[in-house]
A protein has these predicted regions:
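Conserved acidic residues
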Residues: 20, 303, 471
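Proline-centered loop/turn at the N-terminus of a beta-strand
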Residues: 161, 345-347, 469
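Short cationic amphipathic helices and targeting signals
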Residues: 135-144
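N-terminal beta1-alpha1 cap of cysteine-dependent amidohydrolase-like domains
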Residues: 65, 180-351, 355-367, 375-383, ...
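Amide-donor transfer/coupling interface in amidating biosynthetic enzymes
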Residues: 165, 292-294, 338-339, 371-511
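Hydrophobic anchor at the start of a short beta-strand
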Residues: 118, 162, 279-280, 470
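Intein/HINT protein-splicing elements and their conserved insertion hotspots or analogous self-processing inserts
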Residues: 3-133, 147-253, 261
């Protein structure tokens, strides 16, 4: 079915609220068939019967003969239609299906996402193993305790079984008990289970990637204090500081610059357009052929220049370097860029591949002489994730009045590590040229993977020149300037994400 509004979707991440319950919606009429399940495959028993040997690890887990399947299409349809009702969805806090590993896998995956514990309580059944590990059609939902009875009644009214099976806990431990019995059948730390759950990926990662990074990521799973992503802003998220200038009806021209292999120009143009600019698509071939002149004046004058992300020339000449060399080694084009960068009324932004390109152009940019080159990530892999960054105090016109804020941002690069010594990084910090830095869950600057996805010293993720008109960064603010673009965000964020402020700051700069 089409997703008509991404704001109405649910994820398996539990709401960190202990006054809630997890409900199992069973679409199999309690059959609990376990043949062909992940559990049966783990024990290499793909045809479990009721006559298992006493020594068999799956003895007593036979359930009903057969494999999980949809037997009642009408029930599945009724479930789908009920889940689409707006009033029900507004009561749901989290959702996960049980078809990949069974109920236990679904429950602990929800706990992993929220870094919480669980108190699992199963009903009196013939086989607890079959109940917890069958992969029959079904789902788990999280709801507030005061709405449990009404929601159960709604599902039962259409012939679907629905029951409470777990409660979240701030104590990071997963326990299993039987309804009406105080005896605990199983208990384990959330961290232990999550490391076991991740162990196969960890072993592959150690062999494929930098093993030190694999170790750091694996050990981080055991940190019970890590509550994941967060956001704290030093500015009013909902204030449109560019509104007075947009209302004048004038739209300054900004060149959205791209080259063969660049792929982020559309999002970038949308962000600048939303901030009140006239975003002009400019391909390097147009500059090289003379169709576009960055030195133009009058109505054709550009007040902004933005180099977008992607993989110019497939990075085969070094990330961003082939793009930069087409400028550096072309006397006329080089002169245009020099004139543009030296004009005090202009600004420039380089993101991802554009950051790498502009770092290579540093000889043309006043006050950027100390910028580093960007090289392969410490992990030795392409990194695509949502990372946490903190805005530094710097002269960057893009980050004006944002210093001290920390919030998530998209990273997507293979060569994002700032190649400079610790002393050189400290020198940049002393000159207030570090604009953004990666931080951990304590909002402390970090070199640890994956919080620092590329290994840049001092967590460097963005830089500015000495007068702040030119800013470069490896993360992608244009991919998260709207709240709905974020895969995680605080509930109170409305239409605009915090990175929209960056583009509005540019509009205020040119007035």
């Amino acid at each position: 079915a089409p997703v008509r509004d991404v704001r109405e979707t649910l994820t398996p991440e539990l709401a960190r609220d202990e006054d809630t319950s997890l409900l199992l919606i069973d679409l199999s009429n309690g059959l609990d068939r376990i043949n062909g399940s992940v559990l049966s495959q783990c024990y290499n028993q793909l045809n479990i019967t009721s006559e298992q040997n006493d020594s068999d690890p799956l003895n007593g887990a036979a359930g009903v003969a057969g494999v999980a399947d949809v037997l009642d299409a009408g029930m599945l349809k009724a479930f789908f239609e009920l889940m689409q009702s707006r009033d029900l969805r507004q009561q749901l806090l989290a959702y996960h299906d049980r078809s990949d590993g069974g109920l236990f896998a679904a429950l602990v995956e929800m706990a992993f996402a929220a870094r919480m514990g669980l108190e699992i309580e199963v009903p009196e059944v013939e086989s607890i193993l079959s109940f917890l590990f069958n992969e029959e059609p079904g789902a788990v939902i999280q709801v507030a305790n005061d709405g449990v009875e009404a929601i159960i009644n709604r599902f039962e009214a259409v012939g679907i079984s629905c029951q409470v099976v777990a409660k979240p806990s701030a104590i990071q431990e997963v326990t299993i008990g039987v309804e009406g019995d105080t005896k605990i059948l199983f208990n384990a730390a959330r961290s232990t289970l999550q490391q076991r759950w991740s162990s196969a990926s960890y072993e592959i990662q150690k062999r494929r990637d930098n093993p030190a990074c694999a170790d750091e990521e694996f050990q981080a799973l055991a940190d019970d204090l890590d509550q994941g992503l967060s956001a704290d802003l030093t500015f009013d998220l909902n204030e449109d500081i560019a509104a007075p200038y947009i209302n004048k009806g004038l739209r300054p021209r900004v060149a959205i610059l791209r080259e063969q292999g660049v792929n982020s120009q559309v999002e970038m143009a949308a962000a600048f357009h939303s901030a009140g600019f006239s975003a002009i698509d400019v391909h390097m071939s147009e500059i090289l052929s003379g169709q576009v002149d960055l030195s133009s004046s009058g109505k054709d004058q550009f007040q902004g220049l933005v180099a977008c992300g992607g993989f110019s020339y497939g990075d085969v000449l070094g990330a961003g370097e082939g793009w930069a060399k087409s400028i550096l080694f072309h006397e006329k084009i080089r002169g245009q860029f020099v004139d543009f960068f030296e004009r005090k009324s202009t600004f420039a932004l380089g993101v991802c591949n554009g950051c790498q390109m502009m770092a290579t152009l540093k000889a043309l940019i006043p006050g950027a002489e100390a910028w580093p080159k960007f090289v392969a990530n410490r992990s030795e892999q392409f990194e695509a994730r949502l990372s946490l960054v903190k805005v530094e105090q710097s002269p960057s016109i893009f980050l004006n009045e944002m210093a001290g804020s920390h919030m998530p941002i998209v990273v997507s690069h293979g060569e994002g590590r700032a190649d400079l010594s610790h002393a050189a990084a400290e020198s940049l910090r002393g000159d207030s040229q570090i604009a953004l830095r990666y931080v951990d869950h304590d909002v402390e600057y970090t070199d640890q993977y994956p919080m620092n996805p590329n290994g840049s010293p001092l967590g460097i993720s963005g830089l500015t020149n000495d007068d702040g008109r030119v800013t470069i960064m490896m993360p992608h603010p244009e991919r998260v300037f709207r709240t709905v673009q974020n895969s995680w965000h605080p509930e109170e964020w409305q239409d605009d994400g915090p990175w929209m402020r960056m583009f509005r700051n540019a509009r205020v700069f040119v007035a």
